[in-house]
């Protein structure tokens, strides 16, 4: 009997194809597999929001097909307090947070992990993320998924070294086409199910309509870089740096006649600042500061390091030099200027395929 046969793994099941195939792959590797479906948002399930009744039904179908037991748990309270409230607080002060990263940090790899290990007596947990855990030379590394188009390491940079050693990512060595083919051969109900996109608690609703229920709309003015009023906005929280659409100032003709873009948000005066041209100097950054820096590797950074950084999901890696500051903060010097780096977003650092960690962007330096 192999070592894997005595290992119990709880798979986070979402009702999607990736977690479905993850469960089957682990079965093939000899693990004792059980599933767990998390409900993270209280809402009317008939409105097709995340954690809906249909997702749970699909998960039950997959588990029945694979012959594994399914646990269910409600983490809505934990999600509200540790993810959604933080999301609202950040937006209310003009920053643009990433709720998926918060959810992974606070729910999937904290409450789910603790519940699986302590209450369900599991040895490990697994998720359907497209990343790889590699054990080599008595060390464990978080590596990008083989499918670079689906790689999700950006969302998992908050994993601690200890947490990483308690996790498995079965589909990280496959591409999406292979995953769907496996699901089709197994006749899983999730085989052709579309990938979830966007912010889960918003679903198909318009972002502004949803957020305005929690953050009061405070109309204000849009000004140019000289302080001239050129339009009106519906609340600085609803705009992001580099945004072009929805400003309704296209008819304002100045300078070079190029389109207008949001280049800054003055939250204290409830003012939006816009300038013309996608490559305006106020939109281009050559350096920034990160706070709340977290490392997947065992030790924090103590000396400058040359690596690459990703400032948003699906954005290309940029060569950079990172310098440790006090309180585990970093200064990041970019090799080339980058467009619309946004406070509140995460900067994630890599050495080739290896994800080192990351932090929250708090201050940017323009060209």
From Swiss-Prot:
Q: Which SUPFAM superfamilies match?
A: Adenine nucleotide alpha hydrolases-like
Residues where ATP binds: 12-19, 38, 128
Q: What is its EC number?
A: 2.8.1.13
Record key words, sorted: ATP-binding, Cytoplasm, Disulfide bond, Nucleotide-binding, RNA-binding, Transferase, tRNA processing, tRNA-binding
The protein's location, in the record's own words, is: Cytoplasm
GO biological process: one example: tRNA wobble position uridine thiolation
**Residue span of region Interaction with tRNA:** 150-152, 312-313
Single GO term (MF): ATP binding
What are the catalytic residues? 103 (nucleophile), 200 (cysteine persulfide intermediate)
Gene3D superfamilies on file:
Adenine nucleotide alpha hydrolases-like domains (2.30.30.280), HUPs (3.40.50.620), Translation factors (2.40.30.10)
Q: Does the keyword NAD apply?
A: no
Give the reaction(s) catalysed.
S-sulfanyl-L-cysteinyl-[protein] + uridine(34) in tRNA + AH2 + ATP = 2-thiouridine(34) in tRNA + L-cysteinyl-[protein] + A + AMP + diphosphate + H(+)
What does the similarity note say? Belongs to the MnmA/TRMU family.
HAMAP family (alphabetical): tRNA_thiouridyl_MnmA (MF_00144)
What does the UniProt record say this protein does? Catalyzes the 2-thiolation of uridine at the wobble position (U34) of tRNA(Lys), tRNA(Glu) and tRNA(Gln), leading to the formation of s(2)U34, the first step of tRNA-mnm(5)s(2)U34 synthesis. Sulfur is provided by IscS, via a sulfur-relay system. Binds ATP and its substrate tRNAs.
Classification via NCBIfam families: PRK00143.1 (NF001138), trmU (TIGR00420)
Describe its assembly: Interacts with TusE.
Protein's recorded name:
tRNA-specific 2-thiouridylase MnmA
Designated gene of the protein: mnmA
